[in-house]
Amino acid sequence: MNMMTSSILMILILLTTPIIISMTNLPKLIDFPSYATSSIKFSFLLSLLPLLLFFHHNTEYMITNWHWLTINSIKLTMSFKIDYFSILFLSVALFVTWSIMQFSSWYMHSDPHINRFIKYLMMFLITMLILTSANNLFQLFIGWEGVGIMSFLLIGWWYGRADANTAALQAILYNRVGDIGFILAMTWFCLNMNSWELQQIFLTNTNNLVPLTGLLIAATGKSAQFGLHPWLPSAMEGPTPVSALLHSSTMVVAGIFLMIRFHPLTSNNSTIMTAMLCLGAITTLFTAICALTQNDIKKIVAFSTSSQLGLMMVTLGINQPYLAFLHICTHAFFKAMLFMCSGSIIHSLNDEQDIRKMGNMMKAMPFTSSCLIIGSLALTGMPFLTGFYSKDLIIEAINTCNTNAWALMITLIATSMTAVYSMRIIYFVTMTKPRYSPLITINENNPNLINPIKRLALGSILAGFLISLNIPPTNIQILTMPWHLKMTALLITILGFAIALELNNLTLNLSMSKPTKLSSFSTSLGYYPPIMHRIIPQKTLNSSYKLSLNLLDLIWLEKTIPKSTSITQTQLSKMMSNQKGLIKLYFLSFLITISLIFILHTLNPEWFQ
């Protein structure tokens, strides 16, 4: 057994140990959150070994541990694919989860079921790692469904609140739609290629639209692309550590990761590439517009995630899977940090999430505010922060791309809007006058709060540089670009900041005016939730009610038993007799008959002898 295999298996053992321990009585005797945090920390340190080995040798590995069963000629084995995507994602996910886990021990300290919460977070991470390292579709599907069910349990953690239950159900139902696409693709591969192994699928490389459409539907559901996006802002009902983990390195990037994993198939199909490009462009613009008018700090960050996922889908649409993966890795650092800074501020202000009731947090919480600003600047692609290394490359690739100009244009507009809503958070939360109660006592001295944010702040500054150094050489030709194209990313970011600052200054002291149609559109999330969650279900319910009324009450209960019985009896009686119910006529006929008999008897009595 070589060093790569043994270190990967050691990481797996380290991560599963806390879950096994949680099934015994040991968590009552030890500090379970600290134990789980330590196990993830050591897993991260251990994951650096295979990462450096991979960068040194640049060789992919496949670890096959256990042959499960054979169905006809399909072999199902538990095998791990250790390539550039899975090995780098392993280290990034472990680093981010280490910080989130430590943050959870501070944020959830008063929760009576904190041990179970930590266990769920661990399982969430493990299912995501199963998904990223799977070498066959069956194993990938186990990770896919595991991520879905764990998100359901964690979003609905505070199950006493109706909103949390609704949000959890919403997440699982929208993901069911995506799962239909995944199962469709699995079925097609099974029937046509007789295998679920990724190598076999890529080797045959049939340019068929059906499985790729199924995979795109799956990615749309899991990564909250336009059409199946409403569950993502609703998922903010869960605790802040859940939001941080869900949006940074698990769940929402699973759909994008799936499309990256299948890029050898998608790159040969221009139809699916165009579909990905247009879908991503619509998503990134729509969610950026929605983020502009939100007042809940967590919802703004959630919509920013959705917008970045749209940008990743656009990157896949212009056939740049390595760039999309680079953006996943860089995005994980500052997005987790933004959520943790938001959670720290919310916790300190007695669970206040409205940015209009914050202000001047730079004086009250200098460390958290500084990290919030670093995260927001990294999100906008400020030069030499982490986001710049992926976002700048993506915008350069968009500028030099020769497909679909409208999709690329609205992507650039949405990128400019990123700066607008990031500036809005900075302005309302850290600047201006304080708008919260002076009785609130604020304390940010807990090491379980400071250390995780500090680590992620460091990652938000350096990680992009370190990761971009290690992108494997690709066959993309080196381009020389005019300076105005090269500076596009920076220019649209600065433009967004300038517009946001000017608008914030203009609207700070103005009285409330009647909202415009565009403002109403953005505030009500494009009227999508009322249409999808109110009008369509109501119409469906009404039509179902009328249909069931006609089928059950009018047809079955009335016409089948009571009416059919009476109609049958009437028809039979009409066939069997001609009586019409005319009593006088009947008596008259009796009278005539009796009179005739009497007369005949009188005239001829011998006839009756």
Curated annotation (Swiss-Prot):
Molecular functions (GO terms): NADH dehydrogenase (ubiquinone) activity
Reactions listed under catalytic activity: a ubiquinone + NADH + 5 H(+)(in) = a ubiquinol + NAD(+) + 4 H(+)(out)
GO cellular component: mitochondrial inner membrane; respiratory chain complex I
Membrane topology of the entry: Multi-pass membrane protein
Keyword vocabulary terms for this entry: Electron transport, Membrane, Mitochondrion, Mitochondrion inner membrane, NAD, Respiratory chain, Translocase, Transmembrane, Transmembrane helix, Transport, Ubiquinone
Record's keyword annotation contains Transferase: no
Top class in the EC scheme: translocase
Record field: transmembrane: 6-26, 35-55, 84-104, 116-138, 140-160, 171-191, 240-260, 272-292, 300-319, 330-350, 365-385, 409-429, 456-476, 481-501, 581-601
Family: Belongs to the complex I subunit 5 family.
NCBIfam families, A to Z: NDH_I_L (TIGR01974)
Summary of subunit composition and partner proteins: Core subunit of respiratory chain NADH dehydrogenase (Complex I) which is composed of 45 different subunits.
Protein name in UniProt: NADH-ubiquinone oxidoreductase chain 5
Annotated organism of origin: Rattus norvegicus
Taxonomy of the source species: Eukaryota, Metazoa, Chordata, Craniata, Vertebrata
